[in-house]
Amino acid sequence: MTRIRRGYIARRRRTKIRLFASSFRGAHSRLTRTITQQKIRALVSAHRDRDKQKINFRRLWITRINAAIRERGVCYSYSRLINGLYKRQLLLNRKILAQIAISNRNCLYMISNEIIKEVGWKESTG
């Protein structure tokens, strides 16, 4: 009976996984079982952190807008600005507002002053 040589399918699958894990440290880039486990963990972490990144950037934008707005006066806040934008139907998202707050603060003050005039919030001291 002649010897049958193994096919290349399993080897091709393992090399594909090894290429994915080539930057991992230690046995996580050398042993097939640990490579597959680490690949699953890496993909789970990447999926989770993509959502987390969106949350973190939104939080950063809100913090930047709020800091820029509160410099003008104590009574005015981020929530009032966003409420005023919705009432006037201005389509400025938080990312754009944060960029305006950093690069061109006077423009943000002009927007907020227009909203204050239209909505009619009074400056409260105390």
From Swiss-Prot:
InterPro entries linked to this entry: Ribosomal_bL20, RIBOSOMAL_L20_CS, Ribosomal_protein_bL20_C
Organism encoding this protein: Lactuca sativa
PROSITE patterns assigned: RIBOSOMAL_L20
Protein name in the entry: Large ribosomal subunit protein bL20c
Keyword Transferase annotated: no
Keywords: Chloroplast, Plastid, Ribonucleoprotein, Ribosomal protein, RNA-binding, rRNA-binding
Record-linked HAMAP family: Ribosomal_bL20
Gene: rpl20
Family to which this protein belongs: Belongs to the bacterial ribosomal protein bL20 family.
GO terms under cellular component: chloroplast; ribonucleoprotein complex; ribosome
Task of the protein: Binds directly to 23S ribosomal RNA and is necessary for the in vitro assembly process of the 50S ribosomal subunit. It is not involved in the protein synthesizing functions of that subunit.
GO molecular function: rRNA binding; structural constituent of ribosome
A biological process from GO: translation
Alphabetized NCBIfam families for the sequence: rplT_bact (TIGR01032)
Superkingdom, taxonomy of origin: Eukaryota
Localization, UniProt: Plastid, Chloroplast
